Amino acid sequence: MIKRLLSGLILMVAVNSQARQLQEPPTQIVYRFDDHRYLELKGWDCEGELWFTDTKRGIHSQVWSQFYRIFTKRFVHPSERYIAISAWGGGFTVSKDYGRTWSGAHYSPGENEPDGMNLPPYDDIISFTVVNDQGFLQTKHSLYMSSKPFDDPRLAAGGPGITYTLDDGDVYHIDPRSPGPAWGLDYITKRALKNDIAKYHTNYQNLPDKTPEVKNYTGWDHMRCDMDAGR
């Protein structure tokens, strides 16, 4: 009798699993920036493809091709040209053209954290704010920032580059052919910036000490996802 029940349960699970594979994965809105921009997740159990839509500009683009899981911390994003999306567990995908194209962004190498690590544990993250084309990731111990939204013109093709002198008098030069990360593609703390040559770039100078205040934001302040969607 028990064997029959177990066989029946196994068969039922197999049938349900096969039926779900044949069924189109559910799509749900997991974040709204405002009245015309939003993120959709396509997949079962809140994991799958992530898509961005801007109805005003006619943009519909894929941000993550698979395995995306929502960022669960506070998320405020009024910025339009520069869009930065994080995920559960960390990491960034960013767009610098209103969401038409996407590329990866990273934590800068160096001692961003008090313990010498270059990135925070996910549980230490408090919030992620993207405003005025710049991202600010607040953690328990640090504020990670992307650069100001432009590249140092001295490092453009054909530019003079940047010559700088260290405290010991040694002189170095940053060549335009090896300029380092383009704007918006790495996140760094002031702690790490002290020992990084990026501090000589104009787009890394005079960075704020705290996340700028965001007023009159009409979007969501957290991502949302229904685990039972499609069932």
Question: Residue spans of the language-model regions?
Answer:
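Beta-strand-rich domains and repeat architectures in extracellular enzymes and scaffolds
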Residues: 22-51
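Conserved Ser/Thr-centered positions that define the repeating blades of beta-propeller domains
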Residues: 53, 93-96, 140, 144-152, ...
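Beta-propeller fold detector
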Residues: 61-65, 103-109, 175
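Sequence/structural signature of beta-propeller modules
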Residues: 18-27, 153-231
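Repeated scaffold domains used in trafficking and secretory/extracellular systems
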Residues: 24-29, 67-78, 110-128
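Short beta-strand elements that form the blades of beta-propeller/WD-repeat-like
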Residues: 35-43, 79-90, 120-145, 173, ...
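Hydrophobic h-region of N-terminal signal peptides that target proteins for export
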Residues: 7-18
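Asp-box/BNR beta-propeller loop motif
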Residues: 53-59, 93-106
